[in-house]
Amino acid sequence: MASSSPDAPCSCDCFVSVPPASAIPAVIFAKNSDRPRDEVQEVVFIPAGTHTPGSRLQCTYIEVEQVWKTHAVILSRPSWLWGAEMGANELGVCIGNEAVWTKEPVGEGEALLGMDLLRLALERSSTAQAAVHVIAGLLDRYGQGGSCREDPEPFCYHNTFLLADRTEAWVLETAGRLWAAQRIQGGARNISNQLSIGTDISAEHPELRSHAKAQGWWSGQGVFDFAEVFSLTQQPVRMEAAKARFRAGCEMLQRQQGSITAEVMMDILRNKESGICMDSGGFRTTASMVSVLPQDPTKPCVHFLTATPDPSRSVFKPFIFEVGVSQPPQVLSPTFGAQDPVRILPRFQTQVDRRHSLYRGHQAALGLMDEQEQAQLRQEQQSLEQEGLEALRGLLTGEQTPAPQELGSLFQAFVEREHQVYA
């Protein structure tokens, strides 16, 4: 039987700042991906492509119909699956997803994972709003479901999404095939493993209210509050913890209203006291991402990714979609083809070593050092990260105008330099 209990350890936090909340004329997106402790997250670049009409696309568990054209994407993903926990496309659309449990039951059948929906939306959407509709359409056609961890005991949940582009952001929250979405055209917003859309609904599934009424969750009279109607009546302890993280994240964003930068977002993601940077039981923050999406379309979007666990002990490295972008092998996990435990039925009966080169170096360096050596290592990490942030500032102000080829190879260069730090 699949475990669908929200008591199971699982948490994530997504943040977005839309001007005037940002210190600069840019939308700023951030996410911590909290996953099983030993799960490896890789960073994968997928180039744009054109596809044969009517062709099929294999996602984590099921096939879907492919579209004729897909955008280039950068993905931070658990290396055993097809989709992603967070990512961006070449047009400046960013998405992060999170687990959520509602009154709508979680089925045990295999369908699209929330992480598959995320990647499909990035590959197929030119704006955050378009991505909302892509996910809604896929939910309606294929549904969501399947185990979300590499374990013989299935662990299933529904999903919420934070979507952003150069001009605005959207929150999309689902319950089975049903959904509600909220548009954010200014200010700061966060999500943390719970329904957060109340009465301010910008778009919704056409049967959302009639279903709630038929189930006896809503009288059909008065104001319709999505979170109130669809949230579990008795909130388990784990959901209470999510509420605490949500409040803490909200407060941190509010304190920085008007002055939110990439550095502010990184600091929030590194906050351990709130549980946003988590290390609890069998789960921890396995990867993190911060993206700066300038409103000026002539300026490049810059995406910072760690590819390693615990942002407080990791380096945010800049990625830019430009000429000459390639896949750094140091952040790519090994592949196992038909022998992968996710491909053999019943699934996940054995384990394989998915650690990529940067992950191995990062973990080995931190594990072997005493406190003084770790302090020195952290200084080197911070110095490298600051170089990336300085490059961002130079690009945004126009003080730096590197050749496109140099921008395209930026992430590769930072990955190589970080790898050398751990050698």
Curated annotation (Swiss-Prot):
Q: Which GO terms describe its biological process?
A: proteolysis
Tell me any Pfam family this protein matches.
Peptidase_C69
Where is the catalytic site?
C12
Which GO terms of the molecular function aspect are on file?
A: cysteine-type exopeptidase activity; dipeptidase activity
Q: Which InterPro entries match?
A: Peptidase_C69
Question: Which residues are reported to carry the modification Phosphothreonine?
Answer: T52
Q: Which UniProt keywords apply?
A: Phosphoprotein
Family designation: Belongs to the peptidase C69 family. Secernin subfamily.
Q: What is this protein called?
A: Secernin-2
Native species: Rattus norvegicus (Rat)
Encoded by which gene?
A: Scrn2
